[in-house]
């Protein structure tokens, strides 16, 4: 089977709580860094999550 184009990424909270989500994205169709608004349960608000590397 061929290797997929999807790569695992980590979405870090911009609120500084240390909370994160993990997801995948296609690097060929979305080469820029992802920013998405999601719920942060630590501050109990919707905040912007920015893409970071999985260690």
UniProtKB/Swiss-Prot annotation:
<dbReference type="GO" id="GO:0022625">
    <property type="term" value="C:cytosolic large ribosomal subunit"/>
</dbReference>
<feature type="compositionally biased region" description="Polar residues">
    <location>
        <begin position="11"/>
        <end position="23"/>
    </location>
</feature>
<keyword id="KW-0687">Ribonucleoprotein</keyword>
<dbReference type="GO" id="GO:0006412">
    <property type="term" value="P:translation"/>
</dbReference>
<keyword id="KW-0689">Ribosomal protein</keyword>
<dbReference type="InterPro" id="IPR018264">
    <property type="entry name" value="Ribosomal_bL33_CS"/>
</dbReference>
<feature type="region of interest" description="Disordered">
    <location>
        <begin position="1"/>
        <end position="23"/>
    </location>
</feature>
<dbReference type="InterPro" id="IPR011332">
    <property type="entry name" value="Ribosomal_zn-bd"/>
</dbReference>
<dbReference type="Pfam" id="PF00471">
    <property type="entry name" value="Ribosomal_L33"/>
</dbReference>
<protein>
    <recommendedName>
        <fullName>Large ribosomal subunit protein bL33</fullName>
    </recommendedName>
</protein>
<dbReference type="GO" id="GO:0003735">
    <property type="term" value="F:structural constituent of ribosome"/>
</dbReference>
<comment type="similarity">
    <text>Belongs to the bacterial ribosomal protein bL33 family.</text>
</comment>
<dbReference type="InterPro" id="IPR038584">
    <property type="entry name" value="Ribosomal_bL33_sf"/>
</dbReference>
<feature type="compositionally biased region" description="Basic and acidic residues">
    <location>
        <begin position="1"/>
        <end position="10"/>
    </location>
</feature>
<dbReference type="InterPro" id="IPR001705">
    <property type="entry name" value="Ribosomal_bL33"/>
</dbReference>
